[in-house]
């Protein structure tokens, strides 16, 4: 069986090599690149992201990343956003009172978490969506690794999307599965066996 090809999009943000290694461990053939043709033709595209929403969007625009993601989604070709790579799929992010437009695939804003300790850093359980492909077969007490200060805290998109939630004082979206577009707020590449299972399920679905 031929390995599925995955591009980890290199736009200056994210744990590129750790994502590459994690995907390779679940059987994917992985390239880290900003090349448009490679990103468009791969079976799957991973959009990582760490740091500020605005900085990630600026980096994405430099390599026409918005267009790459949009054209893949329009063609039904799978895209997986991770951490800030999930956040930038929403309409906007609000940091320090400044609103930055996102890719706009999902309506709504990514806003700061309200909790005594920020960032939310460490392991947490999730309430996975019924029928989820990403979390299929995982125990309800499976834990995932989060490092973030901002999140999408409500869903205004398609009612058919599969939504997985986590709680850090208040609920926030931990993962979304919406046709060809999927995303996780946690880092699957840092989440041990549970994260590997999520990546394996995504690769298997390519």
From Swiss-Prot:
GO biological process, one term: L-histidine biosynthetic process
The keyword Transmembrane appears for this protein: no
Molecular functions (GO terms): glutaminase activity; imidazoleglycerol-phosphate synthase activity; lyase activity
SUPFAM superfamilies from the UniProt entry: Class I glutamine amidotransferase-like
Reaction(s) catalysed (UniProt annotation): 5-[(5-phospho-1-deoxy-D-ribulos-1-ylimino)methylamino]-1-(5-phospho-beta-D-ribosyl)imidazole-4-carboxamide + L-glutamine = D-erythro-1-(imidazol-4-yl)glycerol 3-phosphate + 5-amino-1-(5-phospho-beta-D-ribosyl)imidazole-4-carboxamide + L-glutamate + H(+); L-glutamine + H2O = L-glutamate + NH4(+)
Pfam families registered for this protein in UniProt: GATase
Name by which UniProt lists this protein: Imidazole glycerol phosphate synthase subunit HisH
Species assigned in the record: Mycobacterium tuberculosis (strain ATCC 25618 / H37Rv)
């Amino acid at each position: 069986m031929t390995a599925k090809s995955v591009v980890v999009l290199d736009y200056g943000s994210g744990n590129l090599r750790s994502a590459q290694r994690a995907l390779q461990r679940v059987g994917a053939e992985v390239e880290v690149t900003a090349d448009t043709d490679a990103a468009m033709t791969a079976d799957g595209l991973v959009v990582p992201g760490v740091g500020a929403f605005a900085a990630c969007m600026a980096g994405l625009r430099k390599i026409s990343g918005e267009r790459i993601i949009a054209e893949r989604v329009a063609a039904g070709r799978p895209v997986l956003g991770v951490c800030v790579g999930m956040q930038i799929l929403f309409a906007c992010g609000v940091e320090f009172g400044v609103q930055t437009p996102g890719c706009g695939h999902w309506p709504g804003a990514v806003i700061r978490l309200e909790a005594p300790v920020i960032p939310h850093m460490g392991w947490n359980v999730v309430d996975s969506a019924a029928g989820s492909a990403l979390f299929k077969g995982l125990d309800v007490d499976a834990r995932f690794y989060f490092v973030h200060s901002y999140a999408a805290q409500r869903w205004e998109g398609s009612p058919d999307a599969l939504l997985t939630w986590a709680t850090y004082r208040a609920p926030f979206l931990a993962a979304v599965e919406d046709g060809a577009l999927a995303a996780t707020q946690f880092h699957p590449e840092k989440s041990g066996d549970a994260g590997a299972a999520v990546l394996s399920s995504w690769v298997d679905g390519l």
